[in-house]
């Protein structure tokens, strides 16, 4: 089902107007996806946020969590959480406060931060610390995502609107893989553990420091501390 914010039919993606040497500029238009899978590219990601997010209401909580830029990305968190909840329709909707707590624990709301994430993962980039390995999966038409790909490159991930759109999509995927590993429906907290590569420790009854930090932020956003 096509989301009302999308600019093109399913199986196509939006390409913004761009100049062409020696000719008139090409206006924004829909282009077919080779695989037929639903994909969203940077131009449409930006356009969706620009057209739709400013009038939305609701979470996340306006708590900076001690960070100077702690509330700067609330509109993007709110918008992309709503978008992916409506597209992917989980039994338990994703909470925007959980996304904000995840961003706080991953990057401290620093949109251009870059960290080494290991030999296979490569670099982790931006607000939600999306790795090079994850970025390749999100864009791979023949890969593990059955549908709803986010086609952004490594440079795009320094843009908060793209990073949050891609990071939330990946969190939904991690909920699926956590469910498979657990043999039951994973909670969103367990999806975060899988996102952070801590699910094995959590399953063993351990409390990794990264999860304690994330949970403390989430509790504060829910006004429980």
Question: What label would you give each PLM region?
Answer:
Residues 86-94, 182:
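Short, charged helix-capping/linker segments at alpha-helix termini
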């Amino acid at each position: 089902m096509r989301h009302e914010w999308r600019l093109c039919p399913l199986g196509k993606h939006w390409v913004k107007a761009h100049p062409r040497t020696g000719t008139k500029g090409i206006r924004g238009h829909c282009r077919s996806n080779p695989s037929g899978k639903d994909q969203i590219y940077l131009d449409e990601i930006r356009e969706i946020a620009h057209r739709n997010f400013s009038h939305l209401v609701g979470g996340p909580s306006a708590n900076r969590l001690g960070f100077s830029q702690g509330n700067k990305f609330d509109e993007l968190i709110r918008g992309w959480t709503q978008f992916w909840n409506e597209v992917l329709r989980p039994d338990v909707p994703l909470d925007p406060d959980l996304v904000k707590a995840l961003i706080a624990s991953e990057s401290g709301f620093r949109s251009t931060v870059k960290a080494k994430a290991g030999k296979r993962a490569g670099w982790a980039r931006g607000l939600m610390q999306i790795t090079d390995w994850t970025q390749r999966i999100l864009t791979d038409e023949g890969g593990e995502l059955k549908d709803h790909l986010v086609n952004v490159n490594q440079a795009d991930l320094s843009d908060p609107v793209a990073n949050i759109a891609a990071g939330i999509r990946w969190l939904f995927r991690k909920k699926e893989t956590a469910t498979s590993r657990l043999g039951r429906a994973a909670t969103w907290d367990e999806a975060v553990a899988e996102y952070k590569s801590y699910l094995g420790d959590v399953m063993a009854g351990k409390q990794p420091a990264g999860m304690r930090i994330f949970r403390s932020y989430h509790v504060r956003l829910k006004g429980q501390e």
